[in-house]
C-alpha cells in the first residue's frame, strides 16, 4: 500500500510487487492506503537524512518509511535482499527493525558503451543492478574513439559514420583483427526511455561526451574539426589517439555547443560529464590554428603546465559556460585540473586520489573514483587464465569494500567537498553483457 495521490510511491509499490512476482510467483495487489496488513510504504519516519529509511517487520505487517520517495525505495532494496527465492511457497520474514541511510549523496556506477555497445534492454538490466545496490547515479559513457553512440540530430554523421568501425582488434592490440564490422547507437527516444527507466528507480543518468580528446569517431564524421583535417577512421584498436578536437577552430566550439545543446534536452541531470581525460597535445603544438589561439588568448606556459595544457582549460571552460548558462554543471576526469579548473567544475578523481585531494583544497566538489579500488574492468583474482579477459590489474572484492573515500590529509572543511564515490566499467575487453554482469 502507498499514499494516495503519490505517483512516485505508487511506482515504488509496483516495483516491489513486480519483483516479488518474478522471484516467488506470488501476485500482490497494489493499492492506495495507509493502514492494514501487508507491506505499507509511508512517507515520514524518524530519519533526518533525505535518503534514509526505516524498515519494520512485525507479525501484523511490513512498514517501510522514509522522508522521501527515494529513501523508501532504498528500504525496498533491503527488503528485496531478505526475500528468499521460493517459487510457490509462503514467504516468512524475521521480525526486525532497521534504520539506515547512505553516507554520500553521490553513489555512482559507470558503463562504457563506446568500446562495446549494449542494447537498451541490457542497459536497463545494468540499471536494475545499480538499484539493488542503492546506486543513485548512472554515468553513461556514450562517445569515444571507437564509436559514437548517441543520436545528435543536427550532426547526423556522428551516428551515420561515427558509430561504425570496420573491425575490432583481438586482445590487447595484438595486430590481429576479427574482420567483422561493428556498430550501434541509441536514438534520442531510446535514451529518453532509459532516463525514465532509471528515474523510476531513483537513479539519475549522467551522460559523458568526452572532449577534447577521445574524439576519433567524431573526427571521422567531421574531419574538419581535427588539426590535420584527416582523413580519420573510427578506431579499431584500444588506447589513446593523438588526433583530438582542434582547439583553435571556431567550428569546434560550435560543434561542442550543438552536441551539448541536444544532450541537455535528452538528459535532465544536473551534471553533464565532459571527459577531459587523456588528451595528447602533440597536434596542438604544430597546429597553426591552435598556436594562433594560444597567442590570441595570451596563454603562456610555465613550470607547472605547458601552453597547450592551458589551452585545454579554454575548451573545458567554454563547455562549462555553455552548460552553466543552461542551468547545468560540468563534471570531468581529474585531468581537467591541468591548466586550471573551470570555475564551477566538479572533479572525478580516477588516477588515484591526488586529483580529488587537490580539487577539494581548491574548494571544488569531488567524486572519488580511483582505479586502484573502483575500476571493475580489472581481474578479480590472480588466476587470470581462468578469468574473462580484462585490461589487467588485480582488484578482488575485498579491496573494493576496504576503500575509504575520505582522505585523512584533508581538513574537516575540505572534506565537505568529497561528495561521493563511483565505480567504473570500461569495456575494451568486455564484448558481451554476460561479462558485464560477471565483472
Task: Annotate each PLM feature.
Residues 112-145:
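A conserved hydrophobic secondary-structure block that centers on an alpha-helix together
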Residues 1-106:
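Contiguous, structured surface segment used for ligand recognition
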Residues 104-107, 134-136, 199-203, 268-272, ...:
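Short, well-ordered coil/turn segments that N-cap beta-strands
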Amino acid at each position: 500500500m502507498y499514499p494516495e495521490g503519490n505517483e512516485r510511491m505508487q511506482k515504488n509499490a509496483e516495483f516491489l510487487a513486480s519483483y516479488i512476482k518474478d522471484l516467488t510467483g506470488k501476485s500482490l495487489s497494489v493499492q492506495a492506503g495507509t493502514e492494514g496488513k501487508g507491506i505499507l510504504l509511508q512517507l515520514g519516519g524518524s530519519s533526518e537524512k533525505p535518503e534514509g529509511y526505516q524498515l519494520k517487520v512485525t507479525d501484523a505487517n511490513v512498514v517501510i518509511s522514509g522522508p522521501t520517495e527515494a529513501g523508501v525505495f532504498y528500504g525496498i532494496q533491503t527488503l528485496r535482499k531478505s526475500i528468499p527465492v521460493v517459487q510457490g511457497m509462503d514467504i516468512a520474514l524475521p521480525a526486525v527493525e532497521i534504520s539506515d541511510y547512505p553516507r554520500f549523496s553521490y553513489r555512482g556506477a559507470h558503463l562504457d558503451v563506446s568500446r562495446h555497445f549494449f542494447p537498451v534492454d541490457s542497459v536497463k538490466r545494468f540499471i536494475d543492478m545499480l538499484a539493488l545496490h542503492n546506486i543513485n547515479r548512472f554515468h553513461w559513457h556514450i562517445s569515444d574513439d571507437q564509436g559514437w553512440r548517441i543520436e545528435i540530430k543536427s550532426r547526423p554523421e556522428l551516428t551515420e559514420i561515427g558509430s561504425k568501425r570496420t573491425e575490432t582488434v583481438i586482445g590487447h592490440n595484438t595486430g590481429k583483427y576479427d574482420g567483422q564490422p561493428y556498430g550501434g547507437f541509441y536514438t534520442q527516444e531510446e535514451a529518453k526511455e532509459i532516463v525514465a527507466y532509471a528515474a523510476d528507480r531513483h537513479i539519475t543518468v549522467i551522460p559523458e561526451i568526452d572532449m577534447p580528446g577521445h574524439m576519433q569517431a567524431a573526427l571521422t564524421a567531421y574531419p574538419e574539426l581535427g588539426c590535420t583535417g584527416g582523413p580519420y577512421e573510427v578506431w579499431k584498436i584500444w588506447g589513446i589517439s593523438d588526433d583530438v578536437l582542434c582547439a583553435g577552430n571556431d567550428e569546434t566550439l560550435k560543434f561542442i555547443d550543438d552536441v551539448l545543446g541536444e544532450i541537455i534536452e535528452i538528459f535532465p541531470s544536473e551534471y553533464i560529464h565532459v571527459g577531459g581525460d587523456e588528451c595528447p597535445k602533440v597536434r596542438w603544438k604544430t597546429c597553426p590554428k591552435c598556436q594562433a589561439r594560444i597567442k590570441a588568448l595570451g596563454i603562456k606556459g610555465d613550470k607547472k603546465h605547458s601552453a597547450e595544457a592551458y589551452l585545454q582549460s579554454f575548451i573545458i571552460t567554454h563547455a562549462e559556460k555553455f552548460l552553466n548558462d543552461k542551468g547545468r554543471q560540468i563534471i570531468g576526469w581529474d585531468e581537467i585540473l591541468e591548466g586550471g579548473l573551470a570555475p564551477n567544475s566538479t572533479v572525478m578523481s580516477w588516477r588515484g586520489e591526488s586529483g580529488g585531494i587537490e580539487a577539494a583544497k581548491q574548494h571544488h566538489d569531488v567524486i572519488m573514483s580511483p582505479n586502484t579500488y573502483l575500476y571493475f574492468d580489472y581481474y578479480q583474482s590472480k588466476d587470470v587464465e581462468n578469468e574473462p579477459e580484462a585490461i589487467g590489474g588485480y582488484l578482488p572484492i575485498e579491496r573494493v569494500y576496504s576503500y575509504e573515500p575520505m582522505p585523512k590529509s584533508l581538513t574537516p572543511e575540505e572534506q565537505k567537498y568529497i561528495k561521493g564515490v563511483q565505480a567504473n566499467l570500461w569495456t575494451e575487453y568486455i564484448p558481451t553483457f554476460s561479462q558485464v554482469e560477471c565483472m
